[in-house]
């Protein structure tokens, strides 16, 4: 009987040891995961004074604080990492790269996204803000992730309305006939400039100033923060407020890199990007008059004009790029 009791006690002790060992291993595994650190490098061609750069600084602070430094964010302005297209490819392949991008570039892969840069798509910034946060745009972003391996953290970085910067005054679309205007190379940009009557020239943003200065191009189109940051007003004195495109940027990462993060960190990146986008939008809107005052103080002429003729001309873009049905979907989201 005594031997039998000793055997039972021994068995209980062995079970207890195994159980404790298993519990110990299960508590240590997540701890090992928590010890991992990740670095995200954000590429952009804009400089350190641009509201979008400042917005990404807010993103950096929020992410690093909420992950206790486990996700580090590094900012690389002025195109020092290379060009957008190459870096988007690196992100697709799993690199720890994020790119400050827009609907024009992403629309090359998911054509529906391109409509976000279509001319005069919405009447107000509030309408556009509603659109970029809608389920419709989230669906397109999901398609981008599934088809091309790029994940949009958020699409709500308003950078301003695009205006023309030229060496001569512009009052109507006819004044732009035949002028060589720098614009990005994606279809929605190119067709918008063509519809107005100008000749689009695709150049990297960093080459725009010398090209305008040397007469390689006759003008450019850009939002005020970018115009001011690049000092384009020094070589293109006349700024015509056509507001033909509202430029909303997005923060894009590679899906492979994103999905290796713990789910908690993935959610933090999305939430902090959305916060940073809203911060950027408010910054651009609140600084608009001050920025225009600085540009005119530097000797430039900013001109308000009747945009109705430009709207009429650019209607052709919607049929050219088969955006008619997409426009109906957009208007449905906006309650129009």
Residue ranges and their predicted role:
Residues 130:
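Short beta-strand-centered segments that line the small-molecule binding cleft or hinge
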Residues 1-39:
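Short, low-complexity disordered leader/linker segments with a strong preference
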Residues 24-126, 136, 145-146, 151-336:
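N-terminal secretory/targeting leader peptides
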């Amino acid at each position: 009987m005594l031997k039998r009791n000793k055997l039972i006690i021994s068995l209980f002790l062995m079970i207890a040891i195994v159980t404790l060992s298993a519990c110990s291993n299960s508590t240590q595994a997540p701890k090992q995961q928590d010890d991992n650190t990740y670095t995200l490098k954000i590429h952009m061609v804009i400089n350190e004074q641009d509201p979008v750069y400042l917005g990404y600084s807010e993103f950096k602070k929020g992410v690093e604080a909420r992950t206790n430094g486990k996700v580090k964010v590094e900012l690389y302005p002025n195109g020092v990492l290379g060009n957008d297209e190459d870096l988007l490819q690196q992100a697709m392949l799993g690199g720890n790269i994020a790119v400050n991008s827009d609907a024009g570039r992403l629309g090359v892969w998911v054509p529906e996204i391109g409509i976000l840069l279509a001319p005069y798509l919405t009447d107000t910034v509030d309408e556009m803000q509603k659109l970029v946060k809608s389920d419709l745009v989230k669906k397109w972003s999901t398609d981008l992730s599934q088809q091309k391996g790029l994940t949009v953290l958020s699409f709500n970085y308003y950078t301003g309305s695009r205006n023309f910067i030229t060496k001569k005054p512009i009052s109507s679309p006819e004044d732009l006939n035949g002028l060589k205007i720098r614009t990005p190379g994606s279809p929605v940009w190119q067709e918008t400039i063509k519809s107005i009557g100008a000749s689009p020239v695709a150049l990297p943003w960093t080459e725009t100033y010398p090209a305008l200065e040397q007469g390689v191009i006759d003008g450019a189109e850009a939002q005020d923060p970018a115009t001011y940051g690049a000092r384009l007003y020094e070589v293109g004195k006349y700024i015509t407020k056509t507001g033909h495109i509202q430029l909303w940027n997005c923060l894009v990462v590679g899906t492979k890199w994103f999905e290796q993060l713990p789910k908690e960190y993935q959610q933090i990146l999305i939430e902090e990007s959305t916060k940073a986008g809203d911060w950027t939008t408010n910054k651009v809107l609140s600084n608009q008059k001050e920025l225009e005052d600085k540009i005119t103080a530097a000797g430039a002429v900013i001109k308000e004009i009747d945009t109705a003729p430009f709207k009429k001309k650019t209607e052709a873009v919607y049929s050219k790029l088969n955006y008619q049905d997409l426009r109906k979907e957009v208007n449905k989201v906006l309650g129009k």
